[in-house]
């Protein structure tokens, strides 16, 4: 762990941001316990801000807590990856069913995220944060708050899966940019079939990049 110095942010926020980035980069297959003392030293804070950050991360699904043992990051198995991507396919393809009524402004918002991702290609955590933002925007465009909340519940697992995919030395980031562009082009052309095909291709490529089959 690389020790950091707190900035103008509050100490709980410093601890939270550092731990979220650290967790996103962990091997997804491994269970990792988090030591409050080590985290306090590494983030340049103290145990109280670390505990506050852990409670926030627990609420968001990034960590789990065991009484008398502390917090840990649960593993994400290959079957988990497949199940998550299958769920995403159902939700995302439903969400774009209203493509004909999407405004140019909505579609322009997708393009802006792609442009930001292009600038963040060398920062896997930021790149995947933007990736999640891209897909969340797509789901929200569907106008179903229940599905949007369900999709949001997958956020922490999507971050870890995505960071793993773009950190393996291949040009997965470049592939993602091209795949996202195909989705946006389909939306701009108001073609539901093309949008569905682009979403399926994108999620299939993600699965292959992460688990290899």
Put a short name on every predicted segment.
Residues 1-101, 207, 212:
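Short linear motifs at protein or domain termini
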Residues 13, 78, 89, 107-111, ...:
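Amphipathic alpha-helical repeat elements characteristic of tetratricopeptide repeat
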Residues 92-126:
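Amphipathic alpha-helical dimerization/coiled-coil segments
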Residues 118-119, 164-213:
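C-terminal all-alpha effector/ligand-binding and dimerization domain
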């Amino acid at each position: 762990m690389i020790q950091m110095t707190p900035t103008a942010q509050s100490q709980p926020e410093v601890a939270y941001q550092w731990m979220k980035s650290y967790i996103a980069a962990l091997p997804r297959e491994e269970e990792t316990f988090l030591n409050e003392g080590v985290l306090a030293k590494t983030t340049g804070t103290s145990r109280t801000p670390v505990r506050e950050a852990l409670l926030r991360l627990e609420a968001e699904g990034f960590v789990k807590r065991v009484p008398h043992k502390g917090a840990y990051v649960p593993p994400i198995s290959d079957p988990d990856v497949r199940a998550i991507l299958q769920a995403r396919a159902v939700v995302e393809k439903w969400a774009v069913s209203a493509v004909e009524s999407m405004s140019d402004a909505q579609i322009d918002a997708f393009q802006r995220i792609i442009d930001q991702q292009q600038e963040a290609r060398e920062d896997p955590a930021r790149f995947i944060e933007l990736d999640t933002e891209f897909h969340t925007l797509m789901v929200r465009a569907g106008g179903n708050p229940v599905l949007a909340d369900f999709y949001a519940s997958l956020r922490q697992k999507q971050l870890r899966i995505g960071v793993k995919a773009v950190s393996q030395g291949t040009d997965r980031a470049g592939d993602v940019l091209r795949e996202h562009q195909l989705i946006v082009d389909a939306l701009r052309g108001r073609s539901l079939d093309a949008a569905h095909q682009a979403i399926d291709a994108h999620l299939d490529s993600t699965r292959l990049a992460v688990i290899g089959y």
